[in-house]
Amino acid sequence: MTAHDRRVAVLMGGWTSEAAVSRVSASFCSKAARLAGWDSVEVELNRNVLDKLDDIQPDRVFNALHGQIGEDGSVQGLLNILNIPYTHSGVLASATAMDKISSRLIFSSVGINVPPLLSLQEDTYVQPADYTGDYVVKPRNDGSSVGVVIVKEGMPAPQRSQWAANTQLIAEEYITGRELTVSVLDGRALCVTEIHVPGQFYDFDAKYKVGGSQHTVPADVPEEVTELSCGWAERAFAILGCRGVARADFIWDEDEDQLYMLEINTQPGMTATSLTPEQAAFCGISGEELVNHLLEIAQCDE
């Protein structure tokens, strides 16, 4: 690649609930790209994005978007049409990973344990049918723990009005345990991190606010849990056809010695508090090296 082929557009923002976080990721990635010798330009995702890309004429796109549009295959499809190589996963892997029902069916089919889904009743309130234990309600297609509600036994069911009318919801059994995560780079697991949060779970604030969570790298868990987490993360990455980097999230019920995969995130956070850059650094890969590598292997769907 010559110096004339090193212009990169870092896509960020948009209009979803995760737009602000995306801009922080973009700042981190754009700076890293410049340090690696790329001519980096941050581009806001809006109705004028095609004109902006036409003006810039990038040789690569670094996808720093989070949530719907940027993570569900939509932007990936646009970049395929424009024939601009982009980082991270393609259309099918992105769309499938974002859909919590489709992805879990696939994970289960290859021997990955996932929390049981519950039949959901929606009216004024949202609650599972014929189930009285603790449960979780969450959007079917969203990330960064946006819109997640935990309902403990004896608590009132959440009102449907808490979510937008067009938001598809799912419910699952609430499983307590230790929160683990594994980043996968080029199909190989980096390491296991344990996440310690002051609240009930690893929510939006815990993920992105400084001091919102504490991380233990590598996680102090039995070797067999480390091996299983890494193995399942690599298996999920492969079966969905992911590219570049992704991050798989788990709950380990230590009392029952059961591991559950919650999801695989094809657009993991790339901020100062994010898990994937932290795991890469633990493995000797700097933020600059990680971003540069993702740009070097950027591609469109074949």
Where are these regions (language model features)?
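Hydrophobic beta-strand scaffold residues
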Residues: 40, 85-86, 114, 135, ...
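Short beta-strand-to-turn element immediately C-terminal to the catalytic PLP-Schiff-base lysine
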Residues: 118-120, 148-154, 184-186, 253, ...
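Phosphate-binding site of ATP-dependent enzymes
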Residues: 153-231, 259-260
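A long amphipathic alpha-helix within ATP-dependent nucleotide-binding catalytic cores
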Residues: 164-168, 210-255, 289, 294-298
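C-terminal active-site "lid" helix and adjoining low-complexity regulatory extension at the edge
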Residues: 258-302
